[in-house]
């Protein structure tokens, strides 16, 4: 999905260590953005190499940006075993 959005807030790049599915240490890199189209507001993250590539980039909150995103529905269970869903928005590109 690509949408014209205003960037309300930008977080610095964060790197978090974790253990991957094969038991190997790995690093998860992300940069968070609070985006609005004037009606809806969402939180989305740029991850991996793309997050690193825009680490020093500044964004003008008064300018609209073409933001290309993908959305992922995540299923999870709470401590009582009830199933819940949440959405993750990942930024692919910001123009």
Label each PLM-derived region with a short phrase.
Residues 1-95:
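Single-stranded nucleic acid-binding surfaces, predominantly the OB-fold ssDNA-binding core
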């Amino acid at each position: 999905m690509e949408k014209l959005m205003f960037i309300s807030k930008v977080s610095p790049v964060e790197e978090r260590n974790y253990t991957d599915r094969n038991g190997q240490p790995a690093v998860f890199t992300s940069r968070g953005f609070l985006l609005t189209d004037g009606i809806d507001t969402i939180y989305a993250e740029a991850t991996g190499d793309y997050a690193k590539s825009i680490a020093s980039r500044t964004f003008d909150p008064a300018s609209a940006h073409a933001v290309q995103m993908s959305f992922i529905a995540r299923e999870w269970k709470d401590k009582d075993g009830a199933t819940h869903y949440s959405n993750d928005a990942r930024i692919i590109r910001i123009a």
